[in-house]
């Protein structure tokens, strides 16, 4: 699961990780605003439907964290409701872990100054201009509130069965290598624990 501010490089990180992994064992899902069908169902339905089968890897870009974080940053969600949603998230991740899933959560972080610089660089390049939208700038204006909401979410949902790893995104190469290294270490650790004793 990758999360972080819009424009911090989550999509690029996913792209790099996909280059390093065997695509035959991957299920990659990007979540935007809920569709009409998803709005007619319980909140968790859209995520349950996309969980990978046992033995496969699911990559979630935009996830169950996105909606509560954005809603809280824009002041459309009370602190009490936000805390209830975070409790639901922690319960969901605990349930996945107890069922044998390896939950890896990466928070891609970029400072406000670094994010502004990155967004301007992307916007100034005709080849990447399309990647920065009015919505990205709208979200950027709420950066401080988004970070405040994010820090609270990370504290509330950082658990032994689903810990967060903060990935500094100032250096794009470091960001990608850190994400890949974390996945490799977590996969190796899980496989070693599952290996039969000799």
Please give the residue ranges for each predicted region.
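Glycine-rich phosphate-binding loop of ATP-dependent small-molecule kinases
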Residues: 1-198
């Amino acid at each position: 699961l990758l999360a972080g501010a819009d424009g911090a490089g989550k999509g690029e990180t996913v792209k790099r990780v996909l280059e390093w992994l065997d695509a035959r064992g991957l299920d990659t899902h990007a979540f935007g605003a809920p569709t009409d069908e998803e709005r007619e169902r319980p909140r968790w339905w859209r995520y349950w439907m996309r969980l990978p089968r046992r033995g496969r890897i699911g990559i979630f870009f935009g996830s169950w964290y996105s909606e509560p974080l954005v809603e809280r940053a824009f002041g459309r969600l009370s602190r009490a409701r936000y805390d209830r949603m975070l409790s639901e998230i922690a319960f969901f991740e605990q349930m996945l872990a107890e069922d044998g899933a390896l939950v890896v959560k990466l928070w891609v972080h970029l400072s406000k100054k670094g994010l502004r610089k990155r967004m301007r660089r992307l916007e100034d390049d005709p080849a990447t201009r399309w990647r920065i939208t009015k919505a990205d700038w709208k979200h950027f204006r709420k950066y401080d509130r988004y970070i405040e909401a994010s820090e609270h979410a990370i504290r509330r949902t950082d658990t032994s069965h689903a810990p967060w790893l903060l990935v500094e995104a100032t250096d794009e190469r470091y960001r990608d290598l850190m994400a890949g290294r974390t996945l490799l270490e977590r996969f190796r650790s899980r496989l070693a624990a599952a290996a039969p004793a000799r």
